[in-house]
Each structure stands twice: as structure tokens, then as C-alpha cells.
Amino acid sequence: MAREFKRSDRVAQEIQKEIAVILQREVKDPRIGMVTVSDVEVSSDLSYAKIFVTFLFDHDEMAIEQGMKGLEKASPYIRSLLGKAMRLRIVPEIRFIYDQSLVEGMRMSNLVTNVVREDEKKHVEESN
């Protein structure tokens, strides 16, 4: 019987949970603010982890840039805390990446909503 998840997938889920807790409770850098870990991708040998994050202030480019700099500066500390929290032989090297999928999804949703409204207006005007 085949496994449902690869080990790297299970480790990625656990890393996502642990880093979310670490960012919320341990990291005190004011540049980071309200950050959400949206996804984690771990290499098959578990030596590298890409951590995709979003910020509460997604509309402010400067704040996002500062938040990413804060995360990069705190990454060695976060990695050490991750090593203490998880029982892994090798703690993956972590890299933070800003996840634009949420922003893009909202933009696409707004575009679709606007097109539907315009289409409804046309149909109302044509029926009058």
C-alpha cells in the first residue's frame, strides 16, 4: 500500500506550523509585523526549505520590503529555534519568499466582479 504523503510533505507541514508559532511568539522585530506563513516547500533531502509568507499590509510595497528584510535578518535565529522545536537530524536552510498569490487572486476576483457588474448594467440598459 502506497503512502499518502511523502516525508518531505509531512516535514513541510510541521515546519509551517512551527515557524508560524516562532514568528508569532519569539521574533520581536517590528519590521515583520503581522506575517502569515502561507506555504512551505522542502527539498527531497530536507536540506532546504522555501517559506512563503504574506503580510497583513499587502498594499504597502515599502512595508513588505522591510518585512522581508526583517525575516532574512532573523532567519538564523528562526532556524535555531526550529531545530530545537523539531526532531530532525538536519535542520533545513530556510529562505523566505513573499507569496503574491493571495494579492493576485484578489486582483483577479475584483476584475471578474467588475466585468460582471458592467455586463449586468448593459443588460439592464438594453432591456429599457
Curated annotation (Swiss-Prot):
GO terms for molecular function: ribosomal small subunit binding. Pfam families: RBFA (PF02033). Signal peptide: none annotated. It is found in: Cytoplasm. One of its GO terms (biological process) is ribosome biogenesis. The keyword Cytoplasm applies. One of its GO terms (cellular component) is cytosol. It comes from the Bacteria. Keywords: Cytoplasm, Ribosome biogenesis. PROSITE patterns: RBFA (PS01319). One of several proteins that assist in the late maturation steps of the functional core of the 30S ribosomal subunit. Associates with free 30S ribosomal subunits (but not with 30S subunits that are part of 70S ribosomes or polysomes). Required for efficient processing of 16S rRNA. May interact with the 5'-terminal helix region of 16S rRNA. Monomer. Binds 30S ribosomal subunits, but not 50S ribosomal subunits or 70S ribosomes. NCBIfam families: rbfA (TIGR00082). This is Ribosome-binding factor A. The gene is rbfA.
